[in-house]
Amino acid sequence: MKKCNLTENNTRYKHLIMQITGTHFNYYLICHRKLWLFANGIQMEHTSDAVYEGKLIHETSYDRRSDKYREIEMNGIKIDYFEPRNRIVHEIKKSDKRSEAHQWQLKYYLYVLEQNGVKECTGLLEYPRLHKTEEVLLTTPDRDAIREMVVAIKTIINNDVCPPKLPRSKCKNCSYFDFCHSGEE
């Protein structure tokens, strides 16, 4: 069994994670271990076919969109497409199923925009494989929940020991699967 401890080599990452990114937020809702590993410098996404496939879907599903909309990077978030005129944030997901983590990641983007003076935005989660679009709004209870989640994320990230792994059945398509489950039958 692999034991994950924060070593001297990667303690430098703890001080860099002052801003929570959309990825941190998404991983928090999916797997605390994945969040901890990612935030502490163990990043497996570059070797993941699923991540590569998601990037391709993002780049090819809506080719004409880049003419009208903008990709935005701000305070640790990276928005796929922003429609300035209507204040709509578009987030594209490769998944063949909807996820609460997807909704909260988009709500977090809306929250960060709001904190930076871009008010009254709405979000659209787009699932090209499903041919579905889902509207996402940010409510007052959502804002409170986001503030609580940010504290919880920072607590996990700054812990010296990573959280336990989830059961194999929940990890099949995870880019960290081999890291967490290698050597198991």
Task: Name these PLM-found stretches.
Residues 1-73:
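Charged, glycine-rich intrinsically disordered N-terminal tails and low-complexity linkers that flank
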Residues 10-18, 84-93, 152-161:
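Short amphipathic alpha-helical segments and their helix-coil junctions
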Residues 22-25, 101, 162-169:
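Structural motif
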Residues 31, 77-96, 109-111:
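Conserved catalytic cores of phosphodiester-cleaving nucleases, focusing on short active-site segments
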Residues 59, 64-76, 115-185:
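Metal-dependent nuclease catalytic regions and adjoining charged, substrate-binding loops involved
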Residues 74-78, 85-87, 101-104, 118:
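Short connector loops at helix/strand junctions that flank enzyme active sites
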Residues 94-98, 140-142:
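A generic structural motif
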Residues 102-113:
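Short, charged, amphipathic alpha-helix that recurs within catalytic cores of restriction-modification
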